[in-house]
């Protein structure tokens, strides 16, 4: 670090690759006896994946459907038309980032990666999908 940084705000850190792979997503229900049970059998098609985060600089969402190429969606903290952050400033955002999945739940691998030394504070994930069954449950 060069120069006098008295009173300056800055981050010090070591760059390392962060990787988180989500487990397979299933619909669940509460059976009469209590607890939670996976609804198996019907087709669940994941449509979108949304990451919610707090004071985060950047990360990537990687979607790999079985038999297809991996799609990487980078989040950089900058949004088109944003007037709060100028070029050259550190962009730490509290927001959400939605990407397309378009794959069946059992055939989609969803990963979050980051190699930035800046903060990456992931809070939760949400998915939206289509559920189709051809039979009635008794």
Show the residue positions of the predicted features.
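Beta-sheet repeat architectures centered on beta-propellers
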Residues: 1-138
């Amino acid at each position: 670090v060069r120069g006098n940084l008295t009173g300056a705000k800055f981050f010090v850190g070591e760059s390392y690759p962060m990787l988180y792979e989500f487990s397979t997503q299933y619909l669940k229900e509460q059976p009469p006896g209590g607890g939670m049970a996976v609804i198996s059998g019907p087709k669940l098609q994941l449509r979108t994946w949304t990451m919610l985060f707090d004071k985060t600089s950047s990360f990537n969402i990687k979607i790999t459907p079985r038999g297809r190429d991996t799609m990487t969606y980078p989040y950089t903290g900058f949004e088109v038309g944003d007037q709060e952050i100028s070029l050259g400033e550190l962009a730490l955002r509290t927001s959400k980032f939605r990407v397309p999945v378009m794959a069946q739940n059992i055939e989609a691998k969803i990963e979050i990666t980051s190699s930035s030394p800046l903060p990456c504070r992931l809070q939760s994930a949400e998915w939206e999908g289509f559920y189709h069954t051809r039979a009635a449950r008794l």
